[in-house]
Amino acid sequence: MAERPRKRPCGPGEHGQRVEWRKWKQQKKEEKKKWKDLKIMKKLERQRAQEEEAKRQEEEEEAAAQRSNQGRPYTLSVALPGSILDNAQSPELRTYLAGQIARACTIFCVDEIVVFDEEGQDTKSVEGEFRGVGKKGQACVQLARILQYLECPQYLRKAFFPKHQDLQFAGILNPLDSPHHMRQDEESEFREGVVVDRPTKAGHGSLVNCGMKKEVKIDKKLDPGLRVTVRLNQQQLPECKTYKGTVVSSQDPRTKAGLYWGYTVRLASCLSAVFAEAPFQDGYDLTIGTSERGSDVASAQLPSFRHALVVFGGLQGLEAAVDADPNLEVADPSVLFDFYVNTCLSQGSRTIRTEEAILISLAALQPGLTQVGSRPASPLSGPRM
């Protein structure tokens, strides 16, 4: 019987190679499994991130909708003659009087202040300076400049207001402390800023100084020195050298968030120009004149409106402004207004100064204006006495 050949025993090297091969295959399997698990985890993370982003966008849309409901749809304008500064006895008192008017208008959320010349002097810009009592029109210029200075946030004044004689005593003025006058670390969705003169990369927006520790990079390229309203992004990267934001209309804080965002200042050469040069397409749809000869303000039933105007007279009342206006052929100022009201019946003083009349009248009118201004304006609605 032939002997079977015996298997040659494998050497230690071959056995070692077989063991290493098994280990390598096992290792590859584990690595493949880890890679698959990692891929699944990344996919889950992407899905989670997308869900969080969708949820964040939904929350932002809900917040925006809530803000739009909280917004104030109407505007309030005040017109007064610049000649009231002529009654002040010194430059310091003239400056302080202008500050009182600015404070009164800010307290009652006035959106526009119109300074008109009741003597009919043609003054349409703030160029020039006040040269003393008796100079026609120059009091309007000084009043407008001080009003603009006070409305501007403190961190922007150096950029927009160089040294000027009209602002010589601005240091005695009380600050307005309105919502757009913010501290450096104060958090807010909106901020006022000035475009800085600094080069940026092609396709990138300009840099804006908003009074914060970092400048804000906006979405548009704008000319340096321009004052803008910026809406800051909710998500900011702490390690980034700048904040991110978007340029929006200066009306957005009022219409979308219900914030009072200061006032604009307009000069009018006469009383009729207050109406004729209105910045709104259809003008003012509610006009109110104030006088001691007017009807009781309590009896006035205000209609719904979008743009209201309240007009105050000077030392001689609105009658003097009507007489001096070459464009008006009426003697009774009440025909110019939807309502001609007396806001302080049974007054104890023979005269009420204009700065006092602003506070008294706006306090009397505010409840009615707030109530009817929040309703949508009807094209058929008209004044009701």
Curated annotation (Swiss-Prot):
Reactions the enzyme catalyzes: uridine in 28S rRNA + S-adenosyl-L-methionine = N(3)-methyluridine in 28S rRNA + S-adenosyl-L-homocysteine + H(+)
Binding site for S-adenosyl-L-methionine: 293, 313, 342-343
Top-level division of the source organism's lineage: Eukaryota
Organism encoding this protein: Mus musculus
Similarity-based family: Belongs to the class IV-like SAM-binding methyltransferase superfamily.
This protein's name: 28S rRNA (uridine-N(3))-methyltransferase
InterPro entries per UniProt: Alpha/beta_knot_MTases, NA-bd_OB-fold, Put_MeTrfase-C9orf114-like, tRNA_m1G_MTases_N
Keyword list, A-Z: Cell cycle, Cell division, Centromere, Chromosome, Cytoplasm, Cytoskeleton, Kinetochore, Methyltransferase, Mitosis, rRNA processing, S-adenosyl-L-methionine, Transferase
GO molecular function: miRNA binding; rRNA (uridine-N3-)-methyltransferase activity; S-adenosyl-L-methionine binding
Protein EC: 2.1.1.-
Primary localization: cytoplasm
Enzyme class per UniProt: transferase
Cellular localisation: Cytoplasm, Cytoskeleton, Spindle; Chromosome, Centromere, Kinetochore; Cytoplasm, Cytoskeleton, Microtubule organizing center, Centrosome
Function: S-adenosyl-L-methionine-dependent methyltransferase that specifically methylates the N3 position of a uridine in 28S rRNA. Required for association of the centrosomes with the poles of the bipolar mitotic spindle during metaphase. Also involved in chromosome alignment. May promote centrosome maturation probably by recruiting A-kinase anchor protein AKAP9 to centrosomes in early mitosis. Binds specifically to miRNA MIR145 hairpin, regulates MIR145 expression at a postranscriptional level.
Annotated segments matching region Disordered: 1-35, 47-72
PANTHER family, per the entry: CLASS IV SAM-BINDING METHYLTRANSFERASE-RELATED, METHYLTRANSFERASE C9ORF114-RELATED
Coiled coil: none
BP term (GO), one: maintenance of centrosome location
Subunit structure: Interacts with INCA1.
Native organism taxonomy: Eukaryota, Metazoa, Chordata, Craniata, Vertebrata
